């Protein structure tokens, strides 16, 4: 029998039996010569940043889920249920996002360009409008953001092509494509998100004590340092509120020099406060006021506060607006400051449009509009200076608020306006006859654009979401060190949410590693099993009826020789 099998195999290799040779050897040949799938194509690992998840005043916001293990599709696909929907920022719209949620998608991954500064302005404005709407609704669908790279872009394009072909092909083509196409399984490495217990929101206070008696008037300068956006790890907050903190630090530097010399040491206390939790209903300011007004007898806030100046989003545009809850009365120091701002802007910077915006405090709202409202509730005269017309403006809470959105010259100009107006109030220069077009800060005492630039670069070199800034982290220690160079009695204040009725709750798993594995669909395994079964059946039949096969081959060979 073995000799007969050898003879058959020898005959099979002859040209006349080439089709039969294909049948016998083709599967083995294909397995041997098929190139292996490159490792880079088989799997890709990349970092993803989860959408906000927090509770504020007992109200949940953002996504409530972090675990992802499902197949990728683009929004063009007809069926998105239990699929990971990939969207590029340039093609993103709120309607597409809603479509994914309505169809019970397993997850949404939004792919961001590497250079955010190069994103077209119409796309930036549209996404800034969408971000608050995304956060306003609670969703159980995990929502992630990823920064585009070549491999991730290739995954998106392949997935998009597969999704598009399913929508436009015939039923047979769809079935064939479904059985043979490559897919991508998206898997996150982290666990389900959990509430972070005992998280501290930190604020930093410093002061310059005025020259004279104990009962000197106090001017308070406030800016919150934290940033906010739809994804905490992408929240750089360049304009809101990196610009405000930059101005506060520059004012601290300038007035510390003035307060160094007795001749220019004013009879005003200057209290500087870099507040934390500004994007979460100004939690740092709220606790600071409670501690200063209700639980201590030695605070500068208790006696003779002239006014509180809050700085929020002052890094671009040709407008400056003073937002007030109650218009200042004539004869008060806050009214004098308002007039000095108008005077300096009109005479020294005529290209700047200055105005006052009056908005009453709405205590029915879950979140206060501006930081000065925290002080106004405690009957302290306060206002917020900003280039924004409304507290609902998109740049105040967007991941699109990157370094390129802050114009250095504009920020320097606005710093000069604020410094000049404050100085004219503190030293009563207008009453002393100083011309309105004469700048106070010149030569060695001028506002330094290089200093402001370096501070802005430092602030926007890291995300500053409140959930990410630990009290012992480098950011807060650097901020405290910077203030200590110019101010006295610099110290930290901490806020911790109440365990029984917390005003705010943060959650973890905000940054994870996601893996995209190239996979075949389940129907491909079924098709492959059918093909293998058919091949094995043919082989089994050939072995069982080997004598028939042998006689058939012999007959074919004899016929060929006879011809």
UniProtKB/Swiss-Prot annotation:
<protein>
    <recommendedName>
        <fullName>BOS complex subunit NCLN</fullName>
    </recommendedName>
</protein>
<keyword id="KW-0812">Transmembrane</keyword>
<keyword id="KW-0732">Signal</keyword>
<dbReference type="GO" id="GO:0043254">
    <property type="term" value="P:regulation of protein-containing complex assembly"/>
</dbReference>
<dbReference type="Pfam" id="PF04389">
    <property type="entry name" value="Peptidase_M28"/>
</dbReference>
<feature type="glycosylation site" description="N-linked (GlcNAc...) asparagine">
    <location>
        <position position="428"/>
    </location>
</feature>
<dbReference type="GO" id="GO:0009966">
    <property type="term" value="P:regulation of signal transduction"/>
</dbReference>
<dbReference type="GO" id="GO:0061635">
    <property type="term" value="P:regulation of protein complex stability"/>
</dbReference>
<dbReference type="GO" id="GO:0160063">
    <property type="term" value="P:multi-pass transmembrane protein insertion into ER membrane"/>
</dbReference>
<dbReference type="InterPro" id="IPR016574">
    <property type="entry name" value="Nicalin"/>
</dbReference>
<feature type="glycosylation site" description="N-linked (GlcNAc...) asparagine">
    <location>
        <position position="241"/>
    </location>
</feature>
<comment type="subunit">
    <text>Component of the back of Sec61 (BOS) complex, composed of NCLN/Nicalin, NOMO1 and TMEM147. The BOS complex is part of the multi-pass translocon (MPT) complex, composed of three subcomplexes, the GEL complex (composed of RAB5IF/OPTI and TMCO1), the BOS complex (composed of NCLN/Nicalin, NOMO1 and TMEM147) and the PAT complex (composed of WDR83OS/Asterix and CCDC47). The MPT complex associates with the SEC61 complex.</text>
</comment>
<feature type="signal peptide">
    <location>
        <begin position="1"/>
        <end position="42"/>
    </location>
</feature>
<feature type="topological domain" description="Lumenal">
    <location>
        <begin position="43"/>
        <end position="522"/>
    </location>
</feature>
<dbReference type="GO" id="GO:0050821">
    <property type="term" value="P:protein stabilization"/>
</dbReference>
<keyword id="KW-0325">Glycoprotein</keyword>
<keyword id="KW-0256">Endoplasmic reticulum</keyword>
<comment type="similarity">
    <text>Belongs to the nicastrin family.</text>
</comment>
<keyword id="KW-1133">Transmembrane helix</keyword>
<dbReference type="GO" id="GO:0160064">
    <property type="term" value="C:multi-pass translocon complex"/>
</dbReference>
<feature type="topological domain" description="Cytoplasmic">
    <location>
        <begin position="544"/>
        <end position="563"/>
    </location>
</feature>
<dbReference type="InterPro" id="IPR007484">
    <property type="entry name" value="Peptidase_M28"/>
</dbReference>
<keyword id="KW-0472">Membrane</keyword>
<feature type="transmembrane region" description="Helical">
    <location>
        <begin position="523"/>
        <end position="543"/>
    </location>
</feature>
<dbReference type="GO" id="GO:0043022">
    <property type="term" value="F:ribosome binding"/>
</dbReference>
<comment type="function">
    <text>Component of the multi-pass translocon (MPT) complex that mediates insertion of multi-pass membrane proteins into the lipid bilayer of membranes. The MPT complex takes over after the SEC61 complex: following membrane insertion of the first few transmembrane segments of proteins by the SEC61 complex, the MPT complex occludes the lateral gate of the SEC61 complex to promote insertion of subsequent transmembrane regions. May antagonize Nodal signaling and subsequent organization of axial structures during mesodermal patterning, via its interaction with NOMO.</text>
</comment>
<dbReference type="GO" id="GO:0005789">
    <property type="term" value="C:endoplasmic reticulum membrane"/>
</dbReference>
């Amino acid at each position: 029998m073995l000799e007969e099998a050898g003879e058959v195999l020898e005959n099979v290799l002859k040209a006349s039996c080439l089709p039969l040779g294909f049948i016998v050897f083709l599967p083995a040949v294909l397995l041997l010569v098929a190139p292996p799938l490159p490792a880079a194509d088989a799997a890709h690992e990349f970092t993803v940043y989860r959408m906000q998840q927090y509770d504020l005043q007992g109200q949940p916001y953002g996504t409530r889920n972090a675990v992802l293990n499902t197949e990728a599709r683009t929004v063009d696909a007809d069926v998105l249920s239990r699929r990971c929907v990939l969207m590029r920022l340039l093609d993103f719209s709120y309607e597409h996002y809603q479509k994914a949620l309505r169809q019970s998608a397993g997850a949404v991954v939004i792919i961001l360009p590497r250079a955010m500064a190069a994103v077209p302005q119409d796309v930036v404005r549209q996404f800034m409008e969408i971000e608050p709407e995304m956060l306003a609704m609670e969703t159980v669908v995990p929502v992630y953001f990823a920064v585009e790279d070549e491999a991730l872009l290739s995954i998106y394009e392949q997935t998009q092509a597969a999704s598009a072909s399913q929508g436009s092909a015939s039923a047979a083509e769809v079935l064939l494509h479904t059985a043979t196409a490559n897919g991508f399984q998206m898997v996150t490495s982290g666990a389900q998100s959990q509430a972070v217990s005992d998280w501290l929101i930190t604020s930093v206070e410093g002061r310059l004590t005025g020259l004279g008696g104990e009962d000197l008037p106090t001017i308070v300068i406030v800016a919150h340092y934290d940033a906010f956006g739809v994804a905490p790890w992408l929240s750089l907050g360049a304009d809101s509120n990196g610009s405000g903190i930059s101005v506060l630090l520059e004012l601290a530097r300038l007035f510390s020099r003035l307060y160094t010399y007795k001749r220019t040491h004013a009879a005003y206390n200057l209290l500087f406060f870099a507040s934390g939790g500004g994007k979460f209903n100004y939690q740092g300011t709220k606790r600071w006021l409670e501690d200063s007004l209700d639980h201590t007898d030695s605070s500068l806030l208790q006696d003779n506060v002239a006014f509180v100046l809050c700085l929020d989003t002052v890094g671009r545009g040709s407008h400056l607006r003073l937002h007030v809850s109650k218009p200042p009365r004539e004869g008060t120091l806050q009214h004098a400051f308002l007039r000095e701002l108008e005077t300096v802007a009109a005479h020294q910077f005529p290209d700047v449009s200055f105005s006052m915006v009056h908005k009453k405090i709405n205590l029915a709202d879950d979140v206060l509009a501006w930081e000065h409202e925290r002080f106004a509730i405690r009957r302290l005269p306060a206002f917020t200076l900003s280039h924004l017309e409304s507290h609902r403006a998109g740049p105040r809470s967007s991941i699109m608020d990157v370094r390129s959105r802050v114009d250095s010259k504009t920020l320097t100009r606005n710093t000069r306006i604020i410094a000049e107006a404050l100085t004219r109030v503190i030293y009563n220069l207008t009453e002393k006859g100083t011309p309105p077009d004469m700048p106070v800060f010149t030569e060695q005492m001028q506002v330094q654009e290089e200093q402001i630039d370096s501070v802005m670069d430092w602030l926007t070199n890291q995300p500053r979401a409140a959930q990410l800034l630990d009290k012992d982290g480098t950011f807060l220690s650097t901020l405290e060190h910077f203030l200590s160079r110019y101010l006295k009695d610099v110290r930290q204040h901490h806020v911790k949410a109440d365990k029984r009725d917390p005003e705010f709750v943060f959650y973890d798993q905000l940054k994870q590693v996601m893996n995209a594995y190239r996979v075949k669909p389940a129907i491909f395994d079924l098709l492959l099993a059918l093909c293998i079964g058919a091949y094995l059946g043919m082989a089994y039949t050939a072995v069982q009826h080997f004598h028939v096969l042998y006689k058939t081959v012999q007959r074919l060979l004899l016929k060929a020789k006879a011809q």
